[in-house]
Amino acid sequence: MSESSISSSKPSVELPQATWSHLQRYPALSKFIKYAESLPPVERLISFNLVVLGSVNQWVSESSSSPRLVKQVVAAGKEGAFKLDELVNLLVFKEGVDGLLYNWKSHSNTPGIWLVWFFVDYVANISNTLLREFLIKPLHLQGSTASKEIGSSGEENKVTDASSLPHVAELSSTTRGMSQEIQSKVKSNYIDPTKDLAKEKYDAIVKPTTDKLQSVYIDPTKTKLNETYQRFTTVYENNLSKSESVPKAIVSTGLDLGNATIEKLKASREDQTNSKPAAVSTN
């Protein structure tokens, strides 16, 4: 299926051409394609497929009765197909097949260790390109400068010295820069705002509650406990110095503290009793 046959059969159908055009650059494959296209069954099959694609395209994309969402989905699918076609053309044929043939000729058609370096660099090249297309560009990251772009010409993508592993160095630079930029974006866009919001909520809600608990309950209770401990220690030491017996001092201390507590309760009750008539008389 040559470009002329596509355009003449169904001019309204736009198909990905990058990979197909590149395949015809190989002489043996180009001859086979032309021979296959000349066969009547293949020619009829191509024409039938083009007619079907043209009808579907006219009904879905160009018809006014087609829903807008369907048109958007079809347009996105077309864009993805062209992008995939260019990606396959770049990675498989330009960087893969053409690069291998170029290095094969530059090494006098002789295999050697350069094949290992070429394979390692080729894998790094694929990884680097996929990172750029599916991670760096969608996330709008800067990354490092690309040595090639999808859709660029094949000659400038040839690897002249595979042993230097240029794409391995490029992949290392890309991943390092991407990691640093992602960490920076996560910190500035998520961690810092979340930290500031949490501090604001703490100052507005939690801190007043903890301060109130501290001042109303914890500090007074702590003061009373210290006073009770000091009073117990003083009474115990006095009783111990008088009796010189630990058990007697403990018992005496308990009795003294109990009597002091009872006296305080009586005093508080008397104060409450005296305050009630005063409150009645005021009314």
Swiss-Prot record:
Protein's cellular compartments: Lipid droplet; Membrane
Modified residues (N-acetylserine): S2
GO terms, biological process: aerobic respiration
Gene Ontology cellular component terms for the protein in this record: lipid droplet; membrane
Major subcellular location class: other
Topology versus the membrane: Peripheral membrane protein
Cystine residue pairs: none
Annotated keywords: Acetylation, Lipid droplet, Membrane
Bilayer-crossing regions: none
Remaining remarks: Present with 2157 molecules/cell in log phase SD medium.
Protein name: Protein PET10
Organism: Saccharomyces cerevisiae (strain ATCC 204508 / S288c) (Baker's yeast)
Lineage: Eukaryota, Fungi, Dikarya, Ascomycota, Saccharomycotina
